[in-house]
Amino acid sequence: MIFFRAVGRCVRMVGMFVAAGTELAVKQPETRQERADWLHRFCARAMRGMGIEINVSGSFPKRGVVISNHLSYLDIVVYAAIHPCVFVSKAEVAGWPVVGWMTTMSGTVYVARGHGGSAMKAREGMQAAVDAGLPVVFFPEGTTSNGSGLLKFHSGLLAQPLDGGAPVTAACIRYGFAEDNGPDVSVADDVCYWGERNMLGHIFTFLGLRGVRAEVRFAEEPIEFSSDTLHRKEAAVEARAAVATLRLGNTIVGEERVPR
């Protein structure tokens, strides 16, 4: 049954990509806002197509920077489905199946590790998005995990909001099942994507799951940093603590649901 469900959803997703590509070709969005709006519409449809429910606690900030833990390629789709935004991602994401095309077309700011000028270009891209009135989302862990804890937060991308004065809001994402998928299925292995796993195989398995639920919690207020640009490592510690606090909250029940 899982296999046939996955095949059916794959076919449905192909149709969605064709429709999204056609929309891009016809409307040719030029501004950051138009591209963010396109991604928002596409991701909202994708969530419905995959049968994923999103529960949200708090409000997606209308401007500034959002920092979050990172569990899967799905994180980008979930955040974009909630509200139009711009992402900052590692350059490798551009080569990911499905997600890479989606993020590139929407104007994601990519960071190439080990390239000195890449971080500066990323900061400029972040500032341009903030100036355009769009929230910027990035994942300071720099990679995904199985959700058992928080990895170290990297400090490089915090320079832009610390320098530019943009508010930084902490967020936390996690996943669960509203339906039983059997004893051999777990969120850590079959929803979270981490380690050296084959992405296409993981996506196919994921598409066969039932009752996947994404839960996103936003902090009520932006982080009040005690550190400045010259002490970004301390700021990264403070940012990590803010996200860790959100992770300690109870499972979201009866909160706002993103319309399906």
Language model feature labels by segment:
Residues 63-65, 108, 133-139, 167, ...:
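Residue-level preference for the first positions of well-ordered beta-strands
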Residues 233, 238-260:
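Cytosolic-facing loops and C-terminal tails of multi-pass membrane proteins
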Residues 18-25, 29, 48-49, 62-116:
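Catalytic core of membrane glycerolipid acyltransferases/transacylases, capturing the structured
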Residues 90, 111, 139, 171-173:
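Generic beta-sheet signal
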Residues 1-55, 101-106:
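A transmembrane-helix-recognition feature enriched in membrane-embedded lipid enzymes
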Residues 119, 126-130, 134-136, 140-158:
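Soluble extracytoplasmic domains of inner/organellar membrane proteins
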Residues 99-100, 148-230, 250-256:
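A cross-family acyltransferase "interaction/gating" segment
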